[in-house]
Amino acid sequence: MTDRPIMTTSAGAPIPDNQNSLTAGERGPILMQDYQLIEKLSHQNRERIPERAVHAKGWGAYGTLTITGDISRYTKAKVLQPGAQTPMLARFSTVAGELGAADAERDVRGFALKFYTQEGNWDLVGNNTPVFFVRDPLKFPDFIHTQKRHPRTHLRSATAMWDFWSLSPESLHQVTILMSDRGLPTDVRHINGYGSHTYSFWNDAGERYWVKFHFKTMQGHKHWTNAEAEQVIGRTRESTQEDLFSAIENGEFPKWKVQVQIMPELDADKTPYNPFDLTKVWPHADYPPIDIGVMELNRNPENYFTEVENAAFSPSNIVPGIGFSPDKMLQARIFSYADAHRHRLGTHYESIPVNQPKCPVHHYHRDGQMNVYGGIKTGNPDAYYEPNSFNGPVEQPSAKEPPLCISGNADRYNHRIGNDDYSQPRALFNLFDAAQKQRLFSNIAAAMKGVPGFIVERQLGHFKLIHPEYEAGVRKALKDAHGYDANTIALNEKITAAE
């Protein structure tokens, strides 16, 4: 008699034979009554769930957030009080690639964090860049379509990408970062993370502050060149997963220094830029980063599917002391992320173990697909509505945010009017040394291969407005790499396009 567990069906019945199907005779057909075979095949048919529409390829690990600084004057959030230690889950990802995409591709890296606080889950869903390609969420689906496959060729389209970017000058800041060294990191241990959006802090006195979150890698930065990345992909498509998993297994726990930039609420009316614009950064000279703690990743998941693929991060998950802002992109993500999880994982995705809060949960949600938590979470089956007289959960007024002053007429305002989309990319470009600029030029030229000349010229016009050297450098790189000549190629394509 073995001491190993007995194999069973999903209903718990022991399985006598997992090697041979039930047939009519030794060579006969399979019988429909072979419920073991039918269960096994039907389950296999349903093993895959819809992949994320964006950020599909990802890597994750558990860790701890430790707060060492004191920002208690700005926020009442317990997770951010001095000495607080909070378990957390991180998921990194590429944006455009599907689940089977190679890790070593030039792309923005997602930087999503879930903190299991004593006041509920707090999710910070950012990237390895402090800005993004668009500032109005109405353009987000259009942008993502340019990063995905062409509906006819089923290939990624450089033309679609550069056409959209060249028609969207607000993308210049992020495009410059993407095409720089930091657009192709060797792995995720050597990248920074950013909340990207402007969030808010608020304290017991009812004071609000605007805040930006930064996570600075303590491992330093490492990047591939395009040529190096091609060699890496030739060896393995899982370079980032291999690196992160192996490092943690070997006790080489990656760490990030956690910083915040804090802006008094009324300063938002005084800055020369819109502090709620996702395509802009706050100058460090005006709002210096404050060190508040360290994030460490120190444990690999036991099962990737249940703990990383099933993980659901949403900016709507906040805790008392942390709030939102008028950032338009953030406002849209508050809805869209949770809605995407309901589509991908089901109505009750927050009851999946990796998404469950560590604190008690009480609410009046009921029924629905995959309701596996035993009914409404009120503690009393008679308290299935609110208000009630049967000791059901009640509100906590102390969790109420201070009032937010808003003004203006409802309208579809042109977000480009009065917006400077060139100064901040120029400041970034001026920080690059000569070698970094040359790699920027070469990377852009490589990414523009096959793009029609009239689109190239439109984009070069934007680069020139950033800095004449930017435009000249990319133009030369295009000629060196592809023999591009605006006087011939662009002119012919303009005529073709007009016809």
Curated annotation (Swiss-Prot):
It catalyses: 2 H2O2 = O2 + 2 H2O. Residues 7-23 have a biased composition (Polar residues). This is Catalase. Its main location: periplasm. The keyword Lipoprotein does not apply. GO terms for cellular component: cytoplasm; periplasmic space. It is an enzyme of class 1 (oxidoreductase). The active site is at H55, N127. Decomposes hydrogen peroxide into water and oxygen; serves to protect cells from the toxic effects of hydrogen peroxide. Residues 1-25 are annotated as: Disordered. Its EC number is 1.11.1.6. Keywords: Heme, Hydrogen peroxide, Iron, Metal-binding, Oxidoreductase, Periplasm, Peroxidase.
